Structures are given as C-alpha cells and as structure tokens.
Amino acid sequence: MKKLLPTSTAGSLPKPAWLAQPETLWSPWKLQGDELVEGKHDALRLSLHEQQLAGIDIVSDGEQTRQHFVTTFIEHLDGVDFENRETVRIRDRYDASVPTVVGAVARKKPVFVEDAKFLRQQTGQPIKWALPGPMTMIDTLYDAHYKSREKLAWEFAKILNQEAKELEAAGVDIIQFDEPAFNVFFDEVNDWGVATLERAIEGLKCETAVHICYGYGIKANTDWKKTLGSEWRQYEEAFPKLQKSSIDIVSLECHNSHVPMELIELIRGKKVMVGAIDVANHAIETPEEVANTLRKALQFVDADKLYPCTNCGMAPLPRRVARGKLNALSAGAEIVRRELLNAR
C-alpha cells in the first residue's frame, strides 16, 4: 500500500437480518438453495459498500458467505464428520460441541475462491481475505483419526496453502490467517505453531498476515479477559518467533485492552495492523480515541508499517454500531495521517 496508514478490518462484519439472525455467532441461514447463493453475494456487495462509504482502504468480504470463521472452511473438507460431534474445550476456556475428524483430511475443491473472484470483480481496491490458521483449526475439532494436534495442524497447513494459492490467483492482495490460539498454547506455538503457519504461506507472492487477538466480544471471551490481570503479555510468547518468520504483517488487539503497547517492539520490521477499535462493546470510539491509539503505536512501529485496524471481527455487533466504528477508524487514521504529513 502506498497510502500512509491504510485502514482495514480484522475480519467479519455483521450480516443483514434477511440473511442470518443479527448479533449471533453460528447463526443459521434464513435462505436456501439458489436464493442463499444470491443472498450471500448481495450481502457481500453490501458489506463492501459499507466499507467503502466508511473510507476503509483495504477491503474484505466481511465474511458474509460464512457462518463462522473456522467451521465454514472445515465444512468443505473431506475427513470431518459434522454429524458425529464431541464436546471439547476451545482455546482452553469454554466448552463447545464440535465436529470429529474421522479420516484423512483433504480439500477436494476450492472453498472461498469463487467468492473472492466475485469480490475482485466489484472493486479495484486492495483486498484482504481471512482464513483460519492451522492451530486454531485443530482447536475447533475433536480428532479421532490422527490423535496428534501437531500432525493434524501440518495436514491443515498443506490444505490452507492450496486454498491460499488459488485466492492469490483470484486477485487477493493480502491473505490473513486467524490464529487466536497463538494467545493460549504457548509451547505449541513455539514448537510447531509458527512452523505450520510458514507451511500455509509457502510459495505465496501476495502479502501475508497473521491475526492474533483475544476474541469476539462474547461472554466466554470477556469473562476470560477478566482473569488475565492488569497487563496482558501473551503476545510476548509468540512475537519473537513471528519476528523471525516470513509473515509480512502481524495483526493485534490494542484499544481498550491491557496489552502493553511496547510489545510491538518485539516484531520490529514487520508491518503491524494495530487494533484501534474495541469490538467487545457497543460504544463507538471517537476519531480522537482512535488517533491516540495510533500515536502510541507509532512509538514502536514506523509510520509506513502501521495499518490501523479493528481488534477482531464485528459479526456479533449491531450493524449501526459496526458502521459507526468503521467511520471512527477512518476518521482517526486521517487525523494522524495529516499530522505525519504536516511534520515532514
């Protein structure tokens, strides 16, 4: 991106009420068959339009065609049985009913490539596309086949690499891997987590990003955050390894969190998507609040490597709130952009 402080969203945006139940994760579709296909594309267009109206520079699909950032990808793979479910502990903090790996996992056909081509036809702006990361995928399943988290992660990394290469060919500019599990399983991150992420990006010429956050604004996550104390230093565990990795961009949570801003120093040299919008409450930030977060970040990251962003996806928020937050993100970035240009 040539523009200084290009804005983007971390992931999902709210779906329209005619497509799925608002403010709900894993909400079932309200349409079926051809109507659902058309409805998803209509929602994707609408999501793009709202990003453009807000002045977002790097746009996305708003994850309008998927029910969930992890399970929708897994649904398209062989070797996973969604009828045969088990209850597992997700991110080591809440129980969920998840599908079971019953055989060798494989991707017989592209998952999101047609959606990406459709989005590419709608805009000339840079596009970022999010995929679940290998470690977060294995943490959202019960494995009755490989019986090894690491082995399954390597298999998913190969599959993600196939998908990512086709997304790149479809015109995607940045491919982001969502890895909230990196904030929880520190030994695995350093033993093989970052290595499997490297496998997922192997051979890509487009830019790559990893998004690590403290989750959506749902009760299980907000309750967990209350146990983390006055300083959240989880990033300290993964950042040194990521700093040495081939990943181009690291996306992290900042605003209204207890993450010490100086931890960004640990990924010096990387581009940093700084979360300047809190997704865990309905209060809409002022542009000045956004600008303050960005000014603090600029102490630890060069201006040409700072990408203002949201802390996480906004699927569970009311559309009005998400719209207001996107507007604040753009306006706050513009304040700091002007300050930087005037100082030159």
Where are these regions (language model features)?
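Domain-level signal for soluble alpha/beta catalytic cores
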Residues: M1-R344
